[in-house]
Amino acid sequence: FKITQQSGAYWKNDKENKMLTRINGVAFRNQEELEAWEKQQQEARERDHRKIGKEMRLFMTDDLVGRGLPMFLPNGYIIWQQLEDYIKGKERERGYLHVMTPCIGTVNLYKTSGHWDHYRENMFPAMEMEGESYVLRPMNCPHHMMIYANRPHSYRQLPIRIGEIAHDFRYESSGTLKGIERGRHFCQN
């Protein structure tokens, strides 16, 4: 067996609770399996997107900007644009209509959609403006449902496919952040 990591964790992920020590480990039937696993782990470290991203100058992070908030550099943004064009082209072939929606919405939008009760703990805190509470958008579907509900539709128009490669924001705990794989700012469709 091998101890792979030691870290701290709050009981039930609540900062008000006691800090516990978390120990991660792996076990194998024999030494050969352990060595094969260690070799695979080393190969995975060499392929880690954070290492490759830094070496190829694709993206960067900086604590001054904020943890979990990656910035794409010119080399990475070229790849980003090519992927986005490819995805949008495939969606257009399948009848998707592309839209653009705001990065914020009212708390009431998320309460109406039913997302508030399930996702508010993973949302950035609400901002108060002119007597209304707004949040950074954690997902696209509530905005898209408002576009759908904007006018009546015949069953003959169905299905209506709405696409948007949108910037979304979730308040992920710092222990779960991992380069562009898991961040507090990301794009999804």
Q: How should each PLM-predicted stretch be described?
A:
Residues 185-187:
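A short glycine-rich beta-alpha junction/loop motif
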Residues 1-177, 181:
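Auxiliary tRNA-acceptor-end handling modules of aminoacyl-tRNA synthetases
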